[in-house]
Regions:
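Short functional hotspots at interaction and active-site rims
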Residues: 1-188
Length: 188
């Protein structure tokens, strides 16, 4: 952060995190309360079609940007970075330091990084350091113990959930705003 603040004293510096979550037609089962003697039903039929949710989060403010896709690879992630930078004003209005894990499509070789974005990789096998990991239980809530006929039905529910979470910045900040997470730096 200090390095970016030195390079760009006229722009705010923000720290964001990103991660991906794979959802499919394989049901998510959770415990539920039921009257004594009754067993709750949760339909399920394992099918292997996937929906990927990519989230970018600014934990200190609870701001999120969500993308849904049917797959992930390095060219697609590069395009996501480009769209994210454009939508958030990175480079033009602010500098974003983006923390991400070491997934294969995040590796720096041949990954074009847009102006205004600086990638910072977390240590290997440390998901507990990734604030975006804490978004997935929130995304999964409306999916638990539900049966979806098609991936489109699942996508509709997930898209609505992501929209709902966009408006609940306090909830996002509570789940992702670790006490040690760096705060934004205002321009000098």
């Amino acid at each position: 952060m200090a390095e970016e603040a030195e390079k760009h004293p006229d722009k705010p510096i923000e720290v964001w995190a990103t991660d991906e979550h794979r959802l499919g037609l394989k049901p998510i089962h959770r415990r539920v309360w039921a009257p004594i003697g009754e067993r709750p039903l949760a339909l399920g039929h394992h099918r292997y079609e996937w929906l990927y949710v990519t989230a970018f989060v600014a934990p200190s403010r609870g701001e999120t940007v969500w993308y849904l896709s049917n797959g992930l690879d390095k060219p697609f992630f590069a395009k996501l970075l480009e769209v994210f930078a454009r939508e958030t004003g990175a480079g033009r209005d602010r500098i974003i330091v983006l923390q991400l894990d070491n997934a294969g499509w995040h590796t720096p070789e041949n990954l074009p990084v847009p102006d205004g974005i600086r990638l910072v990789y977390q240590p290997a096998r440390t998901p507990e350091l990734q604030p975006a990991e804490h978004l997935w239980p929130l995304v999964d809530q409306p999916l638990a113990n539900k049966y979806f006929d098609t991936i489109d039905d699942l996508e509709t529910v997930v898209a609505q959930r992501c929209c709902d979470l966009n408006f609940d910045r306090n909830l996002i900040a509570q789940h992702t705003g670790f006490h040690w997470w760096p705060k934004s730096v205002a321009p000098t």
